[in-house]
Amino acid sequence: MKTLKSFFLNINTLLLMLAALCMTACGNDEETYSDKDDDTAIIKVGMAAPSFELKGLDDSKVTSESLKGKVYILNFFDTTCPDCRKEFPVLQQIYDNYGDKVPVLNVPRSQGVEDAEAYWKENGLTMPIYSDGAQRLYFQFATRTIPRTYIINADGIVIASFNDRPIADYASIERIIRK
């Protein structure tokens, strides 16, 4: 009897832990583009984006300074992340429709750019990928959670932030960049 009781207690504990994991991974669908309740964000909406220099796959460089005067999107991702994969077509559509008018900077958080590039090729993505080296830029923005997408205005101020709650959608991004 004691063994059976212990078995059910262990199963219940496991189910409770799985439910908690699912709730933290999926988030909610609340429409918000502010990160005021995001305790993992270091740079929040209304704050200046930090200075940075990223290297493209073609050895080109992009810097925060070179983007002054433009609205741009900074996306941190991993190709193994399901929510990131959902967001890629949205960002690709923004890239296709706005091109250099609204640069989309895709930065792998914890995987090599080679793996990201392979995923891009397999899935027909053409937007650029940039290297952050040792995740320095990511950790200036946040402590964890991907996808993490920021929209930065022409003055270098973060005007919107999306993470996995909610992930970025085309209509929301377009509404923000058109303001």
Range-by-range predicted roles:
Residues 49-50, 72, 146-147:
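Short loop/turn microsegments at loop-to-beta-strand junctions
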Residues 119-125, 133-178:
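Thiol/disulfide oxidoreductase modules built on the thioredoxin-like
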Residues 1-51, 171-174, 179:
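N-terminal targeting signals for export/organelle localization
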Residues 69-72, 100-103, 126-127, 154:
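Loop/turn elements at helix/coil->beta-strand transitions in domains of secreted/extracellular proteins
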Residues 85-123, 133-140:
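Structural microenvironment flanking redox-active thiols in thiol-disulfide oxidoreductases
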Residues 64-85:
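Short active-site neighborhood of thiol/selenol oxidoreductases, capturing the structured segment around
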